[in-house]
Amino acid sequence: MNKEERAKRQSKIRNFSIIAHIDHGKSTLADRILEKTNALTQREMKAQLLDSMDLERERGITIKLNAVQLNYKAKDGEEYILHLIDTPGHVDFTYEVSRSLAACEGAILVVDAAQGIEAQTLANVYLALDNNLEILPVINKIDLPSADPERVRQEVEDVIGLDASEAVLASAKAGIGIEEILEQIVEKVPAPAGDSEEPLQCMIFDSLYDPYRGVIAYIRVVNGTVKVGDKVRMMATGKEFEVTEVGVFTPKTTQRDELTVGDVGFLAASIKNVGDTRVGDTITHAKRPAAEALPGYRKLNPMVFCGLYPIDSARYNDLRDALEKLELNDSALEFEPETSQALGFGFRCGFLGLLHMEIIQERIEREFKIDLITTAPSVIYKVYLTNGEDVIVDNPSNMPDPQSIDRVEEPFVKASIMVPNDYVGAVMEICQGKRGTFIDMQYLDETRVTLTYEIPLSEIVYDFFDQLKSNTKGYASFDYELIGYKPSKLVKMDILLNNEQVDALSFIVHRDSAYDRGKVIVEKLKELIPRQQFEVPIQATIGNKVVARSTIKAMRKNVLAKCYGGDISRKRKLLDKQKEGKKRMKSVGSVEVPQEAFMAVLKMDDN
């Protein structure tokens, strides 16, 4: 293509993504847009088409972002090229959203006509505003009996401050309003800025590993043009490669000769090493490099850590490969090797949140067929010692000796919870039970309230979200951000089985609730650990002090079965002999801890 053709094509490109709270109909809307632009034949169409991972389809959530190029003939008779970048809506995957938005000029904000604005919608809108996107509100699910589009329209204006007078009323399921949405995209979303003659700058917003083609980078071209055969350089790592193919997704990968300004597509350059392409990096030409890299994304720090161990320790290296491949297209995952006396070799992994942790675990078990044991999730604590040093602890078993600790600080988050006002009491009760401090309460309209609390991250990390949902019948929505560290009275609790400490069961707990937690966990372990041939004491200790204890009684066979009648001293002899044997067994016996027992440490707040 020559310069004029490229410029004409550029003016017809529209890059947009769809943002919404979980379950407001984002993936269905994407399906309808694909149908309307005839991207697929009727036969290829299936629900949630862009959610390509099995896990996404099963859980009905979007985890990874996805990109697709569509051709649309607008009412003005012109052909437009639309790039739709689908994004997740769940709080753990905000990072994926921020990456999608950085590659767009516009965003469709989908709001459920019955439920209105929720916490996650707001968080994503602010991300879109940070990236200076044109936001087009769409009120979805207007065919629901409980829909109230006018109230929601008012809410969009009041809460977000967007002009919603031209908001499209749509129903993705019934296919209403799809054409209006496409027309608005063409009309209101600006064409990509940038110059096809400038030195090349492409932003990598995702990547995938293909065993045959190496690493495939998903890119958005900001300036310049990239063709097959070009020598390109990654600006962050300085590595150079020759481009073997470029192309676009029409959901399927379709090869092209070149990608130019505004294009969203993929680039393969037989990159074999996973570490050479970093998401957020800029690709430029080796011969004529760009003066500076594009502003990447802020690197996300993991909030939650846990140990992952292969059940079969021979598969340790397979687990490392699996984690490296997942890290490639999930740049928020971090991991490093660790060992545990109870579980052998494994990895300490950092995640953005619990859903993220669960998804990674399931992906390893499914995609790589490795059975895992996970330890209790924990957060990063800062421990200040009496000798003036400070240590960072992300694994409870590394906690220093209590005598040498001056104070411990833990991370706090500011949680905003949107909830119908019938449930305010229930939510406040949960937050107080989680050591939350009440900050603020605001009414959005007559029926909904936003509560703001400061809560320790370690309290949210396990089942806060589940409790919130179950106590508000699923109506509460919740978003949190880290605000920093504050001192807390924290102690480390160890669990001893048969007088031996099991390092993988240790956890850090607030001193006030230590006694109760200890009692609950000891009872729970008593139910879960199978009975042995000898008696097993279970103890919960803080330092050298035992705070709770329980005993698993021994299984024993009836040694008196053969004595019919007979003398008492004969029976006594047999019983004493059995006791002696059990004692010997106890001194050498070791106790197998099942995976359920590790999970029990986590699910302690069930009662």
From Swiss-Prot:
Gene3D superfamilies: 3.30.70.240, Elongation factor 4, C-terminal domain, Elongation Factor G (Translational Gtpase), domain 3, P-loop containing nucleotide triphosphate hydrolases, Translation factors
Domain of life: Bacteria
Enzyme Commission code: 3.6.5.n1
Location (main, coarse): membrane
UniProt keyword list: Cell membrane, GTP-binding, Hydrolase, Membrane, Nucleotide-binding, Protein biosynthesis
Reaction(s) this enzyme catalyzes, per UniProt: GTP + H2O = GDP + phosphate + H(+)
SMART domains: EFG_C (SM00838)
Pfam families membership: EFG_C (PF00679), GTP_EFTU (PF00009), GTP_EFTU_D2 (PF03144), LepA_C (PF06421)
UniProt cross-references to SUPFAM superfamilies, sorted A to Z: EF-G C-terminal domain-like (SSF54980), P-loop containing nucleoside triphosphate hydrolases (SSF52540)
GO cellular component entries: plasma membrane
Keyword Membrane: yes
Molecular function terms, GO-annotated: GTP binding; GTPase activity; ribosome binding; translation elongation factor activity
Matches recorded under InterPro entries: EF-4, EFG_III/V, EFG_V-like, EFTu-like_2, G_TR_CS, LepA_C_sf, LepA_CTD, LepA_IV
Enzyme class: hydrolase
Topology class, membrane: Peripheral membrane protein
PROSITE patterns in alphabetical order: G_TR_1 (PS00301), G_TR_2 (PS51722)
Keyword Protein biosynthesis: yes
Binding site for GTP: D23, H24, G25, K26, S27, T28, N140, K141, I142, D143
GO BP field: positive regulation of translation
Domain tr-type G: 11-193
Location in or out of the cell: Cell membrane
Stated role: Required for accurate and efficient protein synthesis under certain stress conditions. May act as a fidelity factor of the translation reaction, by catalyzing a one-codon backward translocation of tRNAs on improperly translocated ribosomes. Back-translocation proceeds from a post-translocation (POST) complex to a pre-translocation (PRE) complex, thus giving elongation factor G a second chance to translocate the tRNAs correctly. Binds to ribosomes in a GTP-dependent manner.
Entry similarity comment: Belongs to the TRAFAC class translation factor GTPase superfamily. Classic translation factor GTPase family. LepA subfamily.
NCBIfam families documented for this protein: lepA, small_GTP
Protein name from the UniProt record: Elongation factor 4
GN (gene name): lepA
